[in-house]
Amino acid sequence: MNNSVDFGGRPFHFIGIGGIGMSALAYVLAKRQLPVSGSDLRPNHITRKLESIGTHIFSRQEASNLEFFGSKVSSTEIELNTQEMFPVGKSTLPQVVCSTAINSNNLEYQAAIELGCPILHRSDVLAALINDYHSVAVAGTHGKTTTSSMIGYMLLEAGLDPTIIVGGEVNAWEGNARLGQSSYLVAEADESDGSLVKHAPEIGIITNIELDHPDHYDTLEEVVDIFQTFAKGCKTLIGSVDCETVRELLRNASGDRQQPTITYSLHQDTEADYTVTNIDYRADGTTALVWEKGKALGVLKLKLLSRHNLSNALAAVAVGRLVGLEFGEIAKGIAGFEGARRRFEFRGEVDGITFIDDYAHHPSEIRATLAAARLQARPGQRVVAIFQPHRYSRTLTFLEEFSESFSHADLVVLTDIYSAGEPNLGLISGENLAEKIAQEHPQVVYQPTLSTVCEYLLKNLRPGDLALFLGAGNLNQAIPEIITTLCAPATATL
């Protein structure tokens, strides 16, 4: 692929523009008044939002889509903004952007090669944007979306007006991206396909490192290599020493680095730069006293409940201090942050049943999310975990770990595996996982489809239950159906 990105006015065409990562980039480029088009076979609210700001989106993927901007220029009905976009002699063949999910037999991808269009990976565009700004890039196996969103919100509330690109939707800016007018950029940096190595931000954060994405990585060592390369490219590196792998990476990198390294921890008995004491988990959130290099800064309050979100907040504190914010400004921003969608997101309450949607799909994420649910649950309240496994490769690789991840749930309801495009080789199924979990947890029910999940929950959820829908697939589509059905004889709080 061609790694050179042209922000000078040459069009961009995104293959699969409706994806969460692709759409965020397309949004920022379109808001920068660059010509953007894209295609997606499954139009959604994200593509409709892009269309509302002038992005042309095709619902079919065809070679002719790449000639859209050329036809606009040659048309006798040229709009004024099109003339401005394409001065005389400017190439109208687009830069074609794709993600790892797009394979080489895609019609638009093949057409791009034949036409000689520059072909960019999604990460190339993000890397170029990171280089264009005073940038903060958040990396890590878990917590990227929440941490980057929290930092973005904190800087926004402090008046720094950042550009923000994250892997989830945030109500504060009604989407997964916003274009700011300042020189600051906050971005989520994805490690899933190895492209993390392309990013060289001014401030880089590593929240934690675990083996995940077994479709791309065979060993933890391979994952660590990617993060080590990322770390070397950061002018300032921030890392959580509560993760043993991050701690080891920082230790090994310290001798090679001329740049500052900043650490944070939930344990004051470490030598971390930022720590906390007096942690208090309440139904309405979390409070803690924050320390900076042994000096008390003040009390931090979060609307989010859990240890992992407090850790994410410490990363935000470190960033805030680096960019010159007073602790009061930092605390105000973090206190107002309500989280990202599908990250322990409240979806409704009816008949005393609370519905929560969470993206957790790795064993560690499930454990942390259910632990947070148990903290929030009232005495006697059941925690019901409804889980849709994501990818055959992940389910097979972490079969043992998944079986040990549901100890905080009173009842586990399991669906079949959401393939995310992977072929079913017959090596693992949702039913196999249910049987494995049942060895550790006596209350496990297997319901293979969304319709059978809905039927089961409508019959078996009780008033007072805390129902958590877990997974990165489409399980959350069942929530509105269940709430609507329950609402027939009752009144829901949405």
UniProtKB/Swiss-Prot annotation:
The keyword ATP-binding applies. Pathway: Cell wall biogenesis; peptidoglycan biosynthesis. It catalyses: UDP-N-acetyl-alpha-D-muramate + L-alanine + ATP = UDP-N-acetyl-alpha-D-muramoyl-L-alanine + ADP + phosphate + H(+). InterPro entries: Mur-like_cat_sf, Mur_ligase_C, Mur_ligase_C_dom_sf, Mur_ligase_cen, Mur_ligase_N, MurCDEF_pg_biosynth, UDP-N-AcMur_Ala_ligase_MurC. GO terms for cellular component: cytoplasm. Its main location: cytoplasm. Cell wall formation. This is UDP-N-acetylmuramate--L-alanine ligase. It comes from Nostoc sp. (strain PCC 7120 / SAG 25.82 / UTEX 2576).
